[in-house]
Regions:
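Non-transmembrane catalytic domains and loops of membrane-associated enzymes and transporters
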Residues: 1-138
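Loop-to-transmembrane boundary segments
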Residues: 3, 136-152
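Serine/threonine-rich low-complexity intrinsically disordered regions
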Residues: 16, 54, 143, 173-174
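Membrane-embedded multi-pass helical conduit in multi-pass membrane proteins
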Residues: 145-199
Length: 199
């Protein structure tokens, strides 16, 4: 094992409606997604506030980590995901430890939250390109999970934009976009239920 992460909670979860939603999002990400990934031997992102790394493994990867580049430019965002991918590429397993809990302060207003999500999305897409090389060595479930996460968020964005444009341009209800979003939600919930039963 090269890295492990625990459950992440929002220390300010009772401050606003947004902090409560983020705390719920963290619970799902840790106890559904990361727990399922760990079952197959590879948590794809050991989140910074609650991650621990094997020192010997970290020392081996330090140069790669400190000099990360993307499209010819120095890159310093998404360091937790990048380091996790480097651990997996070096042949280490990554784990989720449910009993280890760390609290972090989360954004309590929309603007900083959206800025954070944009930064994380860039990191996710950048490191997915690195992870694609790992997928043949990993369990088939992890391949499906990585691909579905990326295609799903892209499809959601397209559906939301097309629905908004339909409302603005035609003043009609965007039933097709609603159907796509509802279907994606049902698939996600079904997968969560199946994962929970398997764990």
């Amino acid at each position: 094992v090269g890295a492990a992460m625990g459950q992440l909670i929002a220390s300010n979860r009772s401050d606003t409606w947004l902090t409560r939603l983020i705390d719920m999002e963290y619970w799902l990400a840790c106890n559904e997604e990361r727990a399922a990934q760990a079952r197959f031997g590879a948590v794809m992102c050991c989140c910074g506030p609650c991650a621990i790394y094997r020192r010997t493994a970290l020392l081996l990867l330090l140069d790669q980590y400190e000099t990360q580049m993307f499209r010819g430019k120095r890159s310093d965002f998404g360091e937790d995901r990048h380091l996790t991918i480097l651990m997996l590429a070096a042949g280490y397993r990554t784990e989720y430890v449910r009993d280890a809990v760390a609290a972090t302060v989360v954004p309590d207003t929309l603007r900083p939250y959206l800025r954070q999500q944009l930064r994380w999305a860039r990191s996710t897409y950048r490191d997915t390109l690195l992870a694609l090389r790992l997928l043949p060595r990993l369990d088939r479930y992890l391949t499906l999970d990585v691909i579905a996460q990326n295609i799903g968020s892209l499809l959601l964005a397209i559906s939301m934009i097309s629905g908004f444009l339909q409302i603005v341009l035609t003043a009609t209800a965007p039933w097709q976009a609603c159907f796509v979003i509802a279907s994606m939600t049902m698939v996600r919930c079904s997968v969560a239920a199946i994962r929970a039963r398997e764990l």
